[in-house]
């Protein structure tokens, strides 16, 4: 590794919203047993001087998130000499700071919960429907059918630990199928990815920004031109290049260009490096960009920083969403786009997420996200109370209406029938405290558009022709999720297609 650091000064445009990213980087490093040295300009210049201006590899992977690591590790195990380039000072990107739940039909936890009727076909149908029929069904089917093997690879080969007694039931799904990593964040994955890359001797070069794809006279992608600290470098790739650079949710100008409705009201959940330049780099190499206007907002985010409130994942186990008047206004497990729009239609364009210990004992989010709990409490957007009067005083919700709503929810939970919004997972009795409540707003989260690929992760032109030597995986692609990505499908997507791309690129080098 040339340089890896969490020096915020090196993160272009870093703001308060990047703090969670920086904390997550340090957490992942600690769990992996890695110490990240604080970078300075002298260290960066020294690293730049020590790198050869031209390097030869079988496979070059751009982007050190979940898709990039999956591709690089798979390519290395297929016998390829591989390098992983990352423009930021540290690895992980969105894969690091996400909740990292992974949808897998017929996974090993489902039978413990009495779920025996799930299938890759049903997962594919949910995904296609969740994207309003705009996703590529061939690509979707590969994702859902390869999901179990990918999850077992993460568990058995990488050593990723998953909770063995619970799953998340994300909105838009017809079955509870999302595996939950220990710690409820991507730190578990990225720590294990980094450790495996180190074990395999894969060079991970941070602070290295890809600028241009190199094509030979036959139109094949054969390398990458990149820069570090103002110096130019060439990475030749005998087999080809895997693009795994993520989306563009942290680039507000680009977001507004493709979807003017997502304006200054929205902050972003994304890592600072998710700025989309690589999409234009791929386009210059002949790749078609598709579905660029489909940009997802995540409904439950910090009103101050825009970061996802992972602590509010109690919603997946029964927490309810209330408006300022103290009323439920939507089914809490609806699609993210539906929830976001519903919140924006409420007074103040925010909501309150409320749950009690009956739900907390299932979801365990307060314990899993203790740092969030402390931070959000200090910010004044979250509190814990023994009774509903305290909750009403904190939120300024009318107490009588709050009490009425909680009683109705509890009554319907006892009868097993949500007459108001048909909660698909079932409501939970909330008559007794302790109670937890947090204020939430939508933030820009996932960009569904990107490079057009086929089921082999090969990049395609506007005419549908394969661009030889170029593969793409993860959020940089644009055909899997249609208009809307269902929760828990991102990690499934990045692992499945990262592995496919890495194996194909390694094979092409032989």
Residue ranges and their predicted role:
Residues 49-67, 83:
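Beta1/beta-strand and adjacent pyrophosphate-binding region of the FAD-binding site
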Residues 212, 401-484:
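A glycine-rich dinucleotide-binding beta-alpha-beta segment and adjacent secondary-structure elements
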Residues 230-231, 236-302, 497-500:
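Glycine-rich loop(s) and the adjacent beta-strand/alpha-helix scaffold that form part
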Residues 77-97:
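Glycine-rich FAD pyrophosphate-binding loop
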Residues 1-43:
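Active-site- and interface-proximal helix/loop "cap" or "latch" segments in soluble metabolic
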Residues 275, 279-397:
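An anion/pyrophosphate-binding glycine-rich loop and adjacent beta-alpha core
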Residues 181-239, 279, 283-285:
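Helical element adjacent to the flavin cofactor pocket in flavoenzyme catalytic cores
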Residues 90-203, 207-209, 321-329, 333, ...:
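Conserved N-terminal/central alpha/beta ligand/cofactor-binding core
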């Amino acid at each position: 590794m040339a340089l890896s650091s969490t020096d915020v000064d090196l993160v272009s445009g870093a703001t308060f919203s990047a703090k969670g990213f920086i904390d997550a980087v340090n957490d992942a490093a600690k769990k992996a047993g890695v110490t990240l040295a604080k970078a300075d300009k002298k260290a960066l210049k020294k690293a730049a001087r020590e790198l050869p201006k031209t390097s030869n590899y079988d496979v070059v992977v751009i982007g050190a998130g979940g898709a990039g690591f999956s591709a690089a590790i798979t390519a290395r195990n297929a016998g390829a000499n591989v390098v992983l380039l990352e423009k930021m000072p540290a690895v992980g990107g969105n894969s690091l700071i996400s909740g990292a739940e992974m949808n897998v039909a017929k996974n090993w936890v489902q039978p413990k919960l009495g779920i025996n009727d799930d299938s890759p076909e049903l997962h594919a149908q949910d995904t296609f429907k969740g994207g309003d029929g705009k996703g590529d069904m061939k690509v979707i089917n590969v994702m859902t059918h390869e999901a179990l093997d990918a999850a077992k690879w993460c568990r058995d080969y990488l050593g990723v630990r998953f909770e063995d007694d619970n799953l998340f039931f994300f909105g838009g799904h017809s079955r509870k199928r999302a595996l939950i990593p220990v710690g409820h964040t991507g730190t578990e994955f990225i720590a294990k990815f980094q450790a495996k890359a180190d074990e395999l001797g894969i060079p991970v070069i941070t602070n290295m920004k890809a600028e241009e794809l190199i094509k030979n006279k036959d139109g094949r992608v054969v390398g990458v031109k990149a820069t570090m600290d103002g110096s130019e470098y060439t990475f030749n790739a005998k087999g080809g290049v895997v693009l795994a650079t993520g989306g563009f949710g942290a680039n507000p100008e680009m977001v507004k260009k493709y979807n003017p409705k997502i304006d200054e009201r929205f902050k972003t959940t994304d890592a600072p490096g998710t700025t989309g330049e690589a999409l234009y780099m791929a386009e210059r190499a002949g790749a078609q960009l598709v579905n660029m206007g489909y940009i997802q907002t995540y409904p439950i985010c910090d009103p101050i920083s825009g970061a996802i409130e992972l602590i509010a994942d109690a919603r997946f186990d029964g927490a309810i969403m209330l408006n300022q008047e103290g009323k439920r206004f939507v089914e809490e497990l609806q699609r993210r786009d539906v929830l976001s729009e519903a919140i924006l239609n409420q007074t103040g364009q925010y909501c309150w997420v409320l749950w009690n210990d009956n739900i907390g004992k299932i979801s365990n989010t307060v314990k899993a996200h203790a740092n969030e709990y402390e931070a959000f409490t200090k910010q004044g957007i979250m509190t814990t109370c023994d009774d509903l009067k305290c909750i009403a005083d904190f939120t300024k919700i009318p107490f009588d209406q709050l009490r009425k709503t909680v009683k109705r929810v509890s009554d319907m939970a006892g009868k097993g029938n949500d007459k108001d919004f048909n909660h698909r997972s079932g409501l939970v009795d909330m008559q007794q405290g302790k109670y937890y409540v947090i204020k939430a707003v939508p933030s820009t989260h996932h960009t569904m558009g990107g490079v057009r690929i086929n089921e082999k992760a090969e990049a395609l032109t506007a005419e549908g022709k394969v661009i030889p030597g170029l593969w793409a995986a993860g959020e940089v692609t644009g055909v899997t999720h249609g208009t809307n990505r269902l929760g828990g499908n991102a990690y499934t997507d990045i692992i499945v297609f990262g592995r496919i791309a890495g194996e194909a690129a390694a094979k092409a080098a032989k």
